[in-house]
C-alpha cells in the first residue's frame, strides 16, 4: 500500500513555474544528456510533463570570479564552473568528438555503442552534431586534413608502445559553447519544459523496487541534514548527474540497493608546455589522444582534453576539493598548450572505493597548496626537489593559472602513479621532441571521478523499475558528444 500523499494540482508555485501534480519524466541534472533528452522529447511531440532539476544556476547566472580577482574563492554552495545549466560543458573548451567512418568501435567518448550498437551510435552522433551546427557550432572539423602526417606520428608512437587515437573534432571554444547552451536553455523554456534551478535531489522515492518520485530541497541547504524536503512525484526518473554527481550516485546506490559495478578513478596531472613543442600535434589533429601502458606497472596512461594556446583552470568539486582542468577559447589565446595525463586506477579486494581513494589524493594535494592547485617544474621532480616561487618566475614556461602555488606534488601522488606519469612523459618525448623539457609544468590534482557503473538494460533502465541512467554520471559516456547522443536515445526509449 502506498503512503505517498495526494498533492493536488498544481500543488506549488516554485522557481517561477507552476509545479504539476505528477510528472511523466523527472530528469536529475541539466548537463548535455539532459538537455538533448528534453530537446528530443519536444521534437517527438508527445506533450509529456517534463521536469529538469539542477543544483546549480541558470547559465546566464554562472560566473567564475577567478578571472577578476585572480584566485578561486570556492563558491558556495556549488562551483559555477561545474554546476548549472549544461553542467561542466558551458565552461569547457567545447570539443565534440566525432568518429571515423571506417571505425568498427568507439575508442573515446564512452560505451553507448555497447547498448545500441556501433551503427546506431554513429547515427545518434550525426543527429546530435546537426543540432549543435543548427545552434551555431563551427562547421570546420579538426583532424581530417593531414592523414599522412598523422600516420607518421602514429608510427612513431607505436615504436614506444603508445597508441594514437585520431578522430574528427568539432571545436566550439568556451565562448561558443556558452552561447549554444544558452540558446538551448531558452528553447526548452519556450517549449514548456519545467526547470528547477538551485535545487538538489536529496533522495529518491522508491517503493517495492519501483520509482515514485524524488525529494528535493534548496541547494543552499545541502549541508543541513535537518532541512525540510519536498516530494515531487513522477512516472519515470532519469539520472543524469554527470561526473560531478558521482558521490551522490554512490550514496543512492548504497541506500536503495541499485545494482552497479565498481567504477574507476583517473588520477594525474595537467601538463603545460609551449605551443612551439606541440605545433605539429596542434596543427594536424588539434587534440592528440595518446594511450599506452609504459613503465614497470603497465597501467593504462592517457592524454586527455588537450588545449592548444589554452589556459589551465581551477574548479571546485564536492567536499570543497580544488581540482585542475584546462580550457581553450576561439579568440583569447596563450602561448602554451595544456593537456591532462591520467592514470586509470582499478580496485578489487579488500579495498574497493575508487572515489574515496581519489578524494584522499586530492585532499592531500590541496593541503600542500593551502587549498590551491599545486604546480611544479618537471626538472625539479627529476632533481627530487620542490619548485619555489622565484624559480617559477625565471622559468621559460610561464604558468597560465596564476593562482597555482609552487611546491612538490610527489608528496601526495603515490609512487606508482607518479612513476607511470614520468615514464609516459619520457616515452612521449621520443614522439614529440621537447615533451620532457625540464621547464614544462605539472599541475595537480587532476582527477576524473567516475561513479559506480550502473547496471542498465538496453532501454537504459536500472534495476529499479522506472529509474533510468544516461550520460557520464552512471558510467555510460565520457564527453559532450556521446552524452548528448545518449540523451537523444533516452528520449526515444521513453516515447
Task: Label the model's feature ranges.
Residues 5-11, 20-103, 109, 146-495:
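Residues forming the flavin
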Residues 14-16:
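Short intrinsically disordered terminal tails
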Residues 83-142:
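Dinucleotide-binding Rossmann-like beta1-alpha1 core, especially the glycine-rich loop
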Amino acid at each position: 500500500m502506498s503512503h505517498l500523499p495526494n498533492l493536488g494540482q498544481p500543488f506549488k508555485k516554485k522557481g517561477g513555474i507552476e509545479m504539476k501534480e505528477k510528472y511523466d519524466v523527472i530528469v536529475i541534472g541539466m548537463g548535455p544528456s539532459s538537455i538533448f533528452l528534453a530537446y528530443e522529447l519536444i521534437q517527438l511531440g508527445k506533450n509529456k510533463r517534463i521536469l529538469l532539476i539542477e543544483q546549480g544556476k541558470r547559465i546566464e547566472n554562472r560566473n567564475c570570479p577567478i578571472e577578476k580577482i585572480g584566485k578561486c574563492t570556492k563558491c558556495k554552495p556549488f562551483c559555477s564552473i561545474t554546476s548549472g545549466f549544461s553542467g561542466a560543458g558551458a565552461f569547457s573548451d567545447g570539443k565534440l568528438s566525432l568518429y571515423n567512418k571506417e571505425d568498427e568501435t568507439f575508442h573515446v567518448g564512452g560505451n553507448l555503442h555497447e547498448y545500441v550498437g556501433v551503427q546506431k551510435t554513429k547515427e545518434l552522433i550525426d543527429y546530435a552534431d546537426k543540432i549543435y551546427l543548427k545552434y551555431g557550432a563551427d562547421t570546420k572539423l579538426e583532424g581530417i586534413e593531414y592523414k599522412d602526417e598523422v600516420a607518421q606520428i602514429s608510427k612513431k608512437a607505436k615504436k614506444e608502445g603508445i597508441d594514437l587515437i585520431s578522430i574528427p573534432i568539432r571545436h566550439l571554444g568556451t565562448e561558443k559553447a556558452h552561447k549554444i547552451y544558452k540558446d538551448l536553455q531558452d528553447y526548452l523554456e519556450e517549449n514548456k519544459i519545467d526547470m528547477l534551478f538551485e535545487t538538489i535531489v536529496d533522495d529518491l522515492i522508491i517503493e517495492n523496487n519501483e520509482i515514485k518520485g524524488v525529494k528535493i530541497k534548496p541547494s543552499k541547504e545541502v549541508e543541513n541534514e535537518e532541512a525540510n524536503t519536498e516530494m515531487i512525484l513522477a512516472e519515470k526518473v532519469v539520472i543524469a548527474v554527470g561526473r560531478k554527481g558521482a558521490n551522490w550516485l554512490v550514496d543512492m546506490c548504497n541506500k536503495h540497493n541499485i545494482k552497479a559495478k565498481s567504477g574507476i578513478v583517473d588520477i594525474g596531472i595537467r601538463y603545460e608546455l609551449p605551443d612551439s613543442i606541440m605545433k605539429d600535434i596542434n596543427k594536424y589533429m588539434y587534440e592528440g589522444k595518446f594511450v599506452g601502458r609504459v613503465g614497470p606497472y603497465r597501467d593504462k596512461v592517457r592524454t586527455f582534453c588537450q588545449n592548444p594556446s589554452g589556459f589551465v583552470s581551477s574548479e571546485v568539486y564536492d567536499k570543497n576539493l580544488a581540482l585542475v582542468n584546462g580550457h581553450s577559447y576561439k579568440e583569447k589565446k596563450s602561448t602554451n598548450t595544456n593537456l591532462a595525463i591520467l592514470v586509470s586506477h582499478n580496485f578489487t579486494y579488500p579495498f574497493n572505493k575508487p572515489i574515496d581513494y581519489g578524494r584522499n589524493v586530492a585532499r592531500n594535494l590541496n593541503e600542500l597548496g593551502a587549498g590551491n592547485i599545486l604546480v611544479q617544474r618537471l626538472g625539479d621532480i627529476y632533481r627530487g626537489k620542490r619548485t619555489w616561487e622565484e624559480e617559477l618566475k625565471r622559468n621559460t614556461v610561464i604558468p597560465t593559472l596564476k593562482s597555482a602555488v609552487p611546491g612538490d606534488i610527489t608528496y601526495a601522488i603515490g609512487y606508482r602513479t607518479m612513476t607511470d606519469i614520468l615514464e609516459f612523459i619520457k616515452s612521449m618525448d621520443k614522439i614529440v621532441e621537447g615533451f620532457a623539457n625540464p621547464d614544462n609544468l605539472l599541475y595537480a590534482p587532476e582527477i576524473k571521478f567516475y561513479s559506480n557503473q550502473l547496471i542498465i538494460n538496453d532501454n537504459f533502465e536500472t534495476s529499479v523499475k522506472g529509474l533510468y541512467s544516461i550520460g557520464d554520471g552512471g558510467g555510460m559516456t565520457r564527453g559532450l558528444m556521446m552524452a548528448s547522443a545518449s540523451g537523444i536515445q533516452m528520449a526515444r526509449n521513453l516515447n
